[in-house]
C-alpha cells in the first residue's frame, strides 16, 4: 500500500494467483488475497486490469474450474478490466515454455504482452 501512496499509479495490472493455484491453495483464499490487492489499488484511485490466470488441466476439473472462476467473479464484483487468459495457448505449446514445462518463456511473454495491450487498447477506446 505504501508504494501505491508514493507513486499514485493511474492503472495497476494485476497478474497474480497462479503459483497459489499450483500449490493447491484454497480458491477462496486466493480470491481473498486478490480482493485485498484490488481494494488497496482502488482506494488509492488506480484503475485495475486483472489478468485471468489458469492452471494445467491435470489439477482436476473441479479445482481448475473453481480457480478459473476467481478472476471473472472479481472482475464483476469490482467492475474492473479482465484480460482474458492466454495460458491455454501457452500450456499447449512446448515451444512457449521454459525447460520446467510450466513457466512461459520469452516467446510466450510476447503473446502475453500482446493480449494485455490489445485488451487495454480496446477498453480505453470504449471510454
Where on the chain are the PLM-derived regions?
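Alpha-helical cap/lid subdomain in secreted, periplasmic
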Residues: 1-127
Amino acid at each position: 500500500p505504501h508504494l501505491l501512496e508514493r507513486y499514485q499509479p493511474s492503472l495497476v495490472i494485476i497478474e497474480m494467483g497462479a503459483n497459489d493455484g499450483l500449490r493447491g491453495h484454497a480458491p477462496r483464499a486466493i480470491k481473498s488475497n486478490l480482493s485485498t490487492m484490488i481494494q488497496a489499488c482502488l482506494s488509492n484511485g488506480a484503475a485495475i486490469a486483472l489478468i485471468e490466470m489458469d492452471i494445467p488441466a491435470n489439477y482436476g476439473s473441479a479445482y481448475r474450474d473453481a480457480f478459473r472462476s476467481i478472476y471473472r467473479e472479481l472482475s464483476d464484483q469490482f467492475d474492473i478490466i479482465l484480460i482474458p487468459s492466454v495460458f491455454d495457448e501457452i500450456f499447449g505449446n512446448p515451444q512457449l515454455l521454459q525447460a520446467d514445462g510450466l513457466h512461459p518463456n520469452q516467446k510466450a511473454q510476447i503473446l502475453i504482452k500482446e493480449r494485455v495491450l490489445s485488451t487495454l487498447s480496446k477498453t480505453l477506446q470504449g471510454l
